[in-house]
Design a protein with these regions (language model features):
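Short acidic, hydrophobic short linear motifs in intrinsically disordered regions
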Residues: 242-245, 254-267, 294-302, 460-472
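Basic, low-complexity terminal or inter-domain segments flanking catalytic cores
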Residues: 2-8, 19, 28, 100, ...
Length: 747
């Protein structure tokens, strides 16, 4: 008797497949497509513009074996469940699978999971639906728009500026935002102002500080030293009396749960994670992690969302958890409901834990350090959003002298509320004096100890960080949750923008490309136009606009601009000026310039070929040298290999021996320093490079938590291996000394 046919479930990734198969049982076979199996060709435009923008999709070559296997499995399957991610991209992948596998509407059923838990997975399988063609059309419209812009504009940039450049509908706008901010900073006219703090003492000899506020209850700013001296002279011999004392309570509410943009912002601020890394770790938490006693568990809901909605089940679970673990007074008293901004897609919930009982402490031992830190952030933010307000006793004291008012503020926590679990990070800290105030009464005389004038100058707007750029893009409607991280990765990898510490700074190349785009393709880099395109894509998704009508409308003006630009720039070659550095050539003393090479940016002498001296750009890493406590710098060898070294170089007391017997002076290692310290010895923890899930480890040989090199995630090279490799190259590669993490690296 032939065996009964199984149902086939297709998801994107093996991790997701593993988690879901555990929930569905033996009647279902769950396999991974590994992403898109059909796409536009890489070598041609792939769009028949004359035939009403008909796309020419082809199978992805690298996935031929997967396609063949899926065809075989689907042919013998009872029903094929297309269970790709619950967004436009996932819907399009499902549609491509249906077309590629030649599935009928009856056999191809669409299921989505906002969270990968047994209840949600089984409920979804029991309630399948048809593929949403509006979602598919919205994704196709975005894909074809991006292909038209990139494929038509990039060759122009290659011919006129430099090979390898690219332009994009969202990336070019993001670059412009960084360039515009830099221009704001350059054109900013700084103005002088002064702060004036009065160091005061009460009758009970308690000292406190009050800052100049104004005169006769009217707020004033001190614009010059003369104005400051006027106040100082007027109050020098005048009495200081407490004018008013205002006491009250201040309530602070928790932040809403995370959406994609706020998760990326907070992970950048609090954890130092790039948006791309944040989304990669979040994907792991969503798809499933092995938790002892629970099996494979999807720990968070879907991470690409701009909705603040929370399910009633999640809200009730939060209520019960807070009351059980913190007490009734820590619960808000009712469900907090947060309003999603207009224009957001409300198909998904906010990002939250799937099971609040799986607290960070419960799952910590089963997670990598990055997974744990990000999960703790998500869990804490969600839990806090349903907790009671934090309550502060607030005191504002105004002290009068000769009609001038000095103000002192102080807040003291009365009830922790949600802050017992979570507090949001800040981009900027306040510089207001916050010294504790003595008990003061109105009319009480206080005594001036001294005046502390301080000259200040107004500051230009700060450069964007990755977090603040994402926030600005979200506020201006540029891109969608799925595009923030790849956009920032693109503009940095193409070196339109570089990181200066935590800030994003445009390069000369980025400014030249932006200038060309503004002059020749103003719509492409116009923020309002780009936002309008996003709104039209939303209309396609809701069925209000036909997707090809959007393409027709866009391409008419775009093709005209393209023709005009090619004519105007015929025979023109645009030179990108060298970017001067603060370093000087060790050989000839000239001011070095920044160049781009195969392995990224480096410093070069401008006198080349007369002088060919080069050196790497120094990038400071988190953590400290385990031997002397100095900074650790990221370095790149001439062959493009990245290593990490103590800033003191040979002056660092660390010593090691290379495979060739030579002495290594100064700490250096292939392992990546992290922000975390060893809980036993306090030294910086390191981890292997790459995207693996290996946990960070201690490299301090005197520490009980020391991890030998052969247990650090990848195989240690032998001296023989290193010498064999040396023969193939003109330069010796760093090699390891036994029981050390350092390897010799030649600059």
């Amino acid at each position: 008797m032939p065996s009964a046919k199984k149902n086939l479930v297709i998801v994107e990734s093996p991790a997701k497949a593993k988690t879901i198969e555990k929930y569905l049982g033996t009647d279902y076979k769950v396999v991974a497509s590994m992403g898109h199996l059909r796409d536009l060709p890489k070598s041609t435009l792939g769009i028949d513009i004359e035939n009403d923008f008909e796309p020419k999709y082809i199978p992805v070559k690298d996935h031929k074996e997967i396609i063949d296997e899926l065809k075989k499995l689907s042919k013998n399957a009872k029903t094929v469940y297309l269970a790709t991610d619950p967004d436009r991209e996932g819907e399009a992948i499902s549609w491509h699978l249906k077309e590629l596998l030649a599935l009928s509407d009856e056999r191809a059923r669409r299921v989505t999971f906002n969270e990968i838990t047994k209840k949600v997975v089984t409920d979804s399988i029991n309630k399948p639906r048809d593929i949403d063609n509006n979602l598919v059309d919205a994704q196709q419209a975005r894909r074809l728009l991006d292909r038209l812009v990139g494929y038509k504009l990039s060759p122009l940039l290659w011919k006129k500026i430099r090979r390898g450049l690219s332009a994009g509908r969202v990336q070019s706008v993001a670059t412009r935002m960084v360039v515009d901010r830099e221009n704001e900073i350059r054109s900013f006219n700084s103005e002088e102002y002064w702060l004036l703090d009065a160091m005061l003492e009460s009758e009970g000899s308690a000292k406190f500080t009050a800052r100049f506020y104004g005169k006769d209850d009217k707020k004033l700013e001190l614009k010059s030293e003369d104005e400051v001296n006027t106040v100082i002279n007027a109050t020098k011999d005048a009495p200081f009396k407490v004018k008013t004392v205002k006491r009250g309570k201040k309530h602070r509410s928790p932040s809403p749960p995370f959406i994609t943009s706020t998760l990326q912002q907070e992970a950048s601020r609090r954890l130092g994670m790039t948006p791309r890394r944040t989304m990669s770790i979040a994907q792991q938490l969503y798809e499933g992690v092995d938790i002892k006693g629970y099996g494979t568990v999807g720990l968070i809901t879907y991470m690409r969302t701009d909705s603040l909605r929370l399910s009633d089940e999640a809200l009730m679970a939060a209520k019960n958890y807070i009351i059980d673990h913190y007490g009734q007074e820590y619960y808000h008293g009712s469900f907090r409901v947060f309003k999603t901004k207009s224009g957001a897609q409300d198909a998904h919930e906010a990002i939250r834990p799937t099971n609040i009982e799986l607290s960070p402490d419960v799952v910590r031992k089963d997670l990598t350090n990055e997974q744990y830190r990000l999960y703790r952030l998500i869990w804490g933010r969600f839990t806090a959003c349903q907790m009671a307000n934090a309550v502060y006793d607030n005191v504002v004291v105004d002290v009068d002298s000769a009609g001038y008012v000095f103000r002192a503020n102080y807040s003291e926590m009365r009830f922790a509320g949600y802050t017992a679990v979570y507090e949001e990070g800040k981009d900027e800290e306040s510089d207001e004096p916050r010294s504790k105030l003595p008990s003061l009464e109105e009319g009480e005389q206080v005594f001036l100890e001294k005046m502390l004038p301080e000259q200040q100058f107004t500051q230009p707007p700060a450069r964007y960080t990755e977090a603040t750029l994402i926030r600005a893009m979200e506020e201006k409607g540029i891109g969608r949750p799925s595009t923030y991280a790849p956009t920032i990765s693109t503009i940095t990898s193409h070196e339109y923008v570089v990181k200066d510490g935590k800030y994003l700074k445009p390069t000369n190349l980025g400014e030249i490309v932006t200038q060309l785009m503004e002059e020749r393709f103003p719509d492409i880099v116009d923020l309002k136009f780009t936002n309008h395109m996003e709104e039209e894509l939303d209309e396609v998704e809701s069925g209000k606009l036909y997707w090809k009508e959007l393409l027709r409308s866009f391409y008419g003006d775009f093709s005209t601009e393209l023709e005009e630009a090619e004519k105007a720039l015929d025979g023109v070659r645009i030179k990108v000026p060298d970017e001067l550095s603060d370093e000087y050539c060790d050989v000839c003393g000239r001011q070095m310039v920044v160049k781009s090479g195969r392995f990224g940016r480096f410093l070069a002498c401008p006198a080349y070929p007369e002088c060919s001296f080069t050196k790497p750009i120094v990038i400071e890493m988190p953590g400290k040298c385990p031997k002397c406590g100095s900074r650790i710098l990221k370095r790149t060898s001439k062959k493009g290999n990245t290593y990490y070294a103590c800033e003191r170089g040979a002056d660092c007391p660390w010593r090691g021996t290379a495979a060739d017997g030579s002495e290594i002076k100064g700490f250096m290692t292939w392992y990546v320093p992290t922000k975390d310290n060893c809980p036993s010895c306090g030294k910086t923890l390191f981890k292997p490079s790459g995207r693996g899930r290996q946990k960070a480890f201690c490299i301090n040989e005197d520490c009980p938590e020391f991890v030998p090199e052969d247990k650090r995630g990848y195989k240690k090279k032998s001296a023989a291996d290193s010498k064999a490799e040396d023969k193939k190259t003109a330069e010796k590669k760093p090699a390891a000394k036994k029981k050390t993490t350092a390897k010799k690296a030649k600059d």
